[in-house]
């Protein structure tokens, strides 16, 4: 009888350990697949900041570096090494600024397209940043009730489900709009 109990105990503990191991492996797989899936949800963030010190409108586009490299290869038809090649970074920066437009929407006046200057790009960790600026913006708009009309189609020609979040920071608060499927031009 003692042997049977020990054997039963052994079988139960072995099965429990196997189940626990399987659950650990399954949990790890679920966690890893969620992390990978989370990155598959293509999103870029653009920040528009009214800089009262310089009087300019600063535009900062943040894209996942991995997405930028894949998109650059698809758009330009050959592999682009954005990490190592300044030329590839500049080429992709040009792509970004050509898919972003902004206009001033002052009540009672026709839309006034703004012409941001391209300042450059840089890599910061897992992100590629692309910078633009509209100089002398604040001084020319003092006292006007205005909205910005924004077009942000960055990466949407590569991935139609691409989501582009635009955060506009002014007067101490942030307003956001999200460009997703079907949204071509939004006001903020």
PLM regions and their residue ranges:
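N-terminal secretory signal peptides that target proteins for export/translocation
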Residues: 1-17
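Short hydrophobic transmembrane-like helices used for membrane targeting/insertion
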Residues: 3-5, 25, 30, 142
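Bacterial N-terminal signal peptides
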Residues: 12, 20-32
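N-terminal soluble domains immediately following signal/targeting peptides that reside
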Residues: 38-188
